[in-house]
Amino acid sequence: MSDSVILRSVKKFGEENHAFESDGFHNNDKKSRLQDKKKGEGARVGFFELFRFSSSKDNWLMFMGSVCALLHGMAQPGMIIVFGILTDIFVEYDIERQELSIPEKVCMNNTIVWINSSFNQNMTNGTSCGLVDINSEVIKFSGIYAGVGVAVLILGYFQIRLWVITGARQIRKMRKFYFRRIMRMEIGWFDCTSVGELNSRFSDDINKIDEAIADQMALFLQRLSTALSGLLLGFYRGWKLTLVILAVSPLIGIGAAVIGLSVAKFTELELKAYAKAGSIADEVLSSIRTVAAFGGENKEVERYEKNLMFAQRWGIWKGMVMGFFTGYMWCLIFFCYALAFWYGSRLVLDEGEYTPGTLIQIFLCVIIAAMNIGNASSCLEIFSTGCSAASSIFQTIDRQPVMDCMSGDGYKLDRIKGEIEFHNVTFHYPSRPEVKILNNLSMVIKPGETTAFVGSSGAGKSTALQLIQRFYDPCEGMVTLDGHDIRSLNIRWLRDQIGIVEQEPVLFSTTIAENIRLGREEATMEDIVQAAKDANAYNFIMALPQQFDTLVGEGGGQMSGGQKQRVAIARALIRKPKILLLDMATSALDNESEAKVQGALNKIQHGHTIISVAHRLSTVRSADVIIGFEHGTAVERGTHEELLERKGVYFMLVTLQSQEDNTHKETGIKGKDTTEGDTPERTFSRGSYQDSLRASIRQRSKSQLSHLSHEPPLAIGDHKSSYEDRKDNDVLVEEVEPAPVRRILKYNISEWPYILVGALCAAINGAVTPIYSLLFSQILKTFSLVDKEQQRSEIYSMCLFFVILGCVSLFTQFLQGYNFAKSGELLTKRLRKFGFKAMLRQDIGWFDDLKNNPGVLTTRLATDASQVQGATGSQVGMMVNSFTNIFVAVLIAFLFNWKLSLVISVFFPFLALSGAVQTKMLTGFASQDKEILEKAGQITNEALSNIRTVAGIGVEGRFIKAFEVELEKSYKTAIRKANVYGLCYAFSQGISFLANSAAYRYGGYLIVYEDLNFSYVFRVVSSIAMSATAVGRTFSYTPSYAKAKISAARFFQLLDRKPPIDVYSGAGEKWDNFQGKIDFIDCKFTYPSRPDIQVLNGLSVSVDPGQTLAFVGSSGCGKSTSIQLLERFYDPDQGTVMIDGHDSKKVNVQFLRSNIGIVSQEPVLFDCSIMDNIKYGDNTKEISVERAIAAAKQAQLHDFVMSLPEKYETNVGIQGSQLSRGEKQRIAIARAIVRDPKILLLDEATSALDTESEKTVQLALDKAREGRTCIVIAHRLSTIQNSDIIAVMSQGVVIEKGTHKKLMDQKGAYYKLVITGAPIS
């Protein structure tokens, strides 16, 4: 066959289609996307844009809710007009009473006359009298108060209910749109976006938008209505005084604008810091086995805390700014009081323009307006936070994906042959534009042929597969299918024609049957069974208790690697694809399974185009065409024989392979052709599905270190069967009793100086309002004085007091804001840190629990810690403020008239009852809502973590459907919450009007019959009214208080849990001369999440110090489980693991793990530099750069690292996604070498490497094994033949053991496995 590649002419079919773009434009488009991302980060969202998801029904609900809020807001200014009229009546009555108290004066003909004066004198100087019937006037006004109270009850209920409902509807829609848009994004977008950050946006950011568009809008409109109607009434009753009071309003407006911008900026910075911290938490919790194995718990807590520090700093700044603004507002308001009474008294006394009642009406209307503008400003902070949170959400929603997998655009071919051509394709990943992966690649893949790609790690083999699936588009050149540029084809249709089986298969948290059905939605049960048989999975599935209904756990964590692989192959086969892509598809299988699966794959070859990347020798040798890759280019093409003659890349790989096989043959296998499929297994090269890209962002590495996580089932298939049925049980487990506030505050105890100063300032601020009511009533009393000079003198004194109050408020409000922000942010940081630390403290079995998958835990860290501030921080300040307000107000009231105070106090129990009901009900709703959103979080986390698999098999729609089912439940909870919250709020608002009605009725009686001064009635009523407002305000904190207690309870539940294997505990045995002798004595074990399946069934095997023990056996026989017992991820149910004669259960966990190093098949790396990843091998001390480089050299890594632009400072990406598998594996080996362990565990340690690298790394491992006890797990028997002991396992027990020679001579299970690949039984 010719070496040259013949390229056919391309039909540029559908050039008018937007999917078909010129190369230059396409490349520019990618660059512009990255620029857009940078520009978009600072983009602001306008407030009204928050309501972009409202439907016509929502508009109607918002309109009606707004009408109710606006009418409710008018109630208070309206009653001020009534109050002014009442004031004039009381003043007139008091003047009459004072005049008639003079013995020489009497009331005759409605005029006060001197008994001894002439008629003319009396007519000139007389004051009218007897015209006021106080009793009947008071009854009339009491009736008006009662009527308004009832109206407020109705309006208050509907304003809250309607706004909460419309908020819930819009947030539900927003979550749907956001998730749908994310699921439509091209893979390149995920390369540059962290899953942890996206999960944080789903929970934290959307919750902040929810707060901004629900009940807060109702409260804002109510306060705005009060402010506007107050101003209008002020102008109507007296424009002069109104203008004087408003003279300071520009100062308020300027202050509000400056503060609003500052708060928005600080909020944005705070959210970014929290998103970064969330990303770290997600990465760590997803790789918990690796963290535990290398003792990285404390290092990870420090890394997490570092990002929390930034968030804390911005939170404190935000609190300071808000505190200053509140003080600034109060200061201006009190200065207004002083100015108003000074100027107003002149208009009343000197010019006679106003009556005292008119002055009070104007003053109170304008001041109520100003106060409500101040109160409304607290809503502005929430709106501003909502807008900041929305910017990244809306930016994602508005972003048009470059490749929309759910779009109907593009052509669908009637029939396809399956001919694929690469035309001068050049490509780099969006996340690493400086590294060229494919360089002018040209090749033809003929239909119906099996084509094998071979080449060293990082040569671009797997990248070529990703371009065929259109996960990316070439930067230059084109890929064609049957002569059509694949950019002109419909993406969903294209991927439906392709089956993919990768080396690290991803299964989803549902049943085995549903996982297979994901390959083809309309597949019947017969199709599923047949696919399982074709993939050699049927027998092991039928051996499980629930057979095809067995739940596989998150990422297939409940199964061994081989079992996962076979289910993934069944999923690909059921698609009946025209093109089958095999990326190391049988690497995780033992010999017997591999041979059978390979046979199944060969059976379907006819009529299919098969592309196999770096398969075993038998597969590559029998391929119709072999294409050799080097540096991103196809350098040779031909059959096995042709390429051997050519003596190029392929020849070199085969030569290396043959040398190892010859070595193997000499040790006991004679006359057997090593090129047959059932011989010792070897791999040509490693091109993982994650080569040089961020695949692992979504691909949770489920290695032997990280794959046995038994996570909750999620409904991507049959939603009810795999998810709904478990709901009731979950709820029972999840319910928590709200935490006592005392304990929450205990965690804030180290900030007691801040809390004390803040509380003192809050107490002063709380006392200011009742003192104001005292001064106010005193001014009213002044107007009834007969001597005008005395009136002036007293009014000026009151004005001076107001100025002093303003100055005090400025100072105390600022200190309150700062101190509580400081204490609250420190508490949030502490709780997040403690929560994260407590999570890392838990045993691995805890992470297997369906409630504790990474998505749920990350969501919990993000929301719970910040919600605990609802019972601490600034909320404490507001509570202290309110309670002081109530105490001082009640004290003043009882001092001046205890009878009237008692009558009004009758209404307090009703307020308290309303608050208690509100707290109780909302606590319940908060608990339900949190649980539902956590379940939704599990769905998003699983989908986004495995986005390549989701896109490859086209199940985006299933995840979207499952997610939306959970959202419906959350919506129903919100509807119930709306009714309770609305009723309680309405009651707390309306009761004050009813209390006023009763107070004025009884006050009128006391004035007439007990000669009480009218100013005392005002003093008592306004004091109690102030305290009632404070009570109402206290209960407005109950929703966040309720959430806080639930969130805190979850934290305490976590902090209180004492894990059976405690990594932080100092207890346990330690000894100096650690040898590394290991004895498994009759170990029996079942995983906590699957107690019905016995994994180890009496395992007994020993290895002396410095010896190598190799475990051999079929997939799922318990090999990896034994390693997990040795690492103390679990303890055996029965039997003992002995280390140097010590029972492992009694050995200190950190001490034990510090003497063990591990290299697993699918290594987990962290999102930091190569140097930091190597140093992660030993977290007990600072590793020198020299020592790390020495380890890298030993692992054959150094030369590769030095070829990178940033050398050892190169960031590996999340989960090592910027590197090929071979590169990742060598870093993992260097990490283990740096640890200098006494016991070395190698779990398929070289399986990820190409032949060239493997040989050198194997030598490095052999060297690393010297003087160490070593346990090796390998399917490839040639890697373990030199072991001191080979233990053959079957069904959780060792069935034979000995050296390679001894076992070959015995001709038992091991011999059969080596020679024939027969089952071990």
Curated annotation (Swiss-Prot):
Topological domains, Extracellular: 84-147, 237-240, 341-353, 777-794, 1001-1011
Record domain ABC transmembrane type-1: where: 62-385, 755-1043
GO BP: bile acid and bile salt transport; bile acid metabolic process; canalicular bile acid transport; cholesterol homeostasis; fatty acid metabolic process; lipid homeostasis; phospholipid homeostasis; positive regulation of bile acid secretion
Keywords per UniProt: ATP-binding, Cell membrane, Endosome, Glycoprotein, Lipid transport, Membrane, Nucleotide-binding, Phosphoprotein, Repeat, Translocase, Transmembrane, Transmembrane helix, Transport, Ubl conjugation
PTM (free text): N-glycosylated. Ubiquitinated; short-chain ubiquitination regulates cell-Surface expression of ABCB11.
Sequence positions bearing Phosphoserine: S587, S692, S703, S706, S1321
Region Interaction with HAX1: start-end pairs: 651-674
ABC transporter domain: residues covered: 420-656, 1078-1316
Enzyme class: translocase
Annotated positions binding ATP 1: G455, S456, S457, G458, A459, G460, K461, S462
Gene Ontology CC terms, in alphabetical order: apical part of cell; apical plasma membrane; cell surface; endosome; intercellular canaliculus; intracellular canaliculus; membrane; plasma membrane
Entries under Pfam families matching the protein: ABC_membrane (PF00664), ABC_tran (PF00005)
Record SMART domains: AAA (SM00382)
Positions bearing carbohydrate: N109, N116, N122, N125
UniProt-annotated stretches for the region Disordered: 662-722
Transmembrane segments: 63-83, 148-168, 216-236, 241-261, 320-340, 354-374, 756-776, 795-815, 870-890, 891-911, 980-1000, 1012-1032
Phenotype when the gene is knocked out: Transgenic mice with up-regulated liver canalicular membrane expression of Abcb11 appear healthy and normal and demonstrate any difference in longevity. Transgenic mice exhibit a normal reproductive rate and gender distribution and are born in a normal Mendelian distribution. Transgenic mice have food consumption identical to their background strain controls. Transgenic mice manifest increases of both bile flow and biliary lipid secretion and are resistant to the development of hepatic steatosis.
Inhibition and activation profile: The uptake of taurocholate is inhibited by taurolithocholate sulfate with an IC(50) of 9 uM. Pravastatin competitively inhibits the transport of taurocholic acid. Cyclosporin A, glibenclamide, rifampicin and troglitazonestrongly competitively inhibit the transport activity of taurocholate. The canalicular transport activity of taurocholate is strongly dependent on canalicular membrane cholesterol content. The uptake of taurocholate is increased by short- and medium-chain fatty acids. Cholesterol increases transport capacity of taurocholate without affecting the affinity for the substrate.
EC numbers on record: 7.6.2.-
Ranges of biased composition (kind: Basic and acidic residues): 662-684
Stored SUPFAM superfamilies: ABC transporter transmembrane region, P-loop containing nucleoside triphosphate hydrolases
Listed PROSITE patterns: ABC_TM1F, ABC_TRANSPORTER_1, ABC_TRANSPORTER_2
Domain notes: Multifunctional polypeptide with two homologous halves, each containing a hydrophobic membrane-anchoring domain and an ATP binding cassette (ABC) domain.
Function: Catalyzes the transport of the major hydrophobic bile salts, such as taurine and glycine-conjugated cholic acid across the canalicular membrane of hepatocytes in an ATP-dependent manner, therefore participates in hepatic bile acid homeostasis and consequently to lipid homeostasis through regulation of biliary lipid secretion in a bile salts dependent manner. Transports taurine-conjugated bile salts more rapidly than glycine-conjugated bile salts.
Family label: Belongs to the ABC transporter superfamily. ABCB family. Multidrug resistance exporter (TC 3.A.1.201) subfamily.
Protein name stated in the entry: Bile salt export pump
Annotated organism of origin: Mus musculus
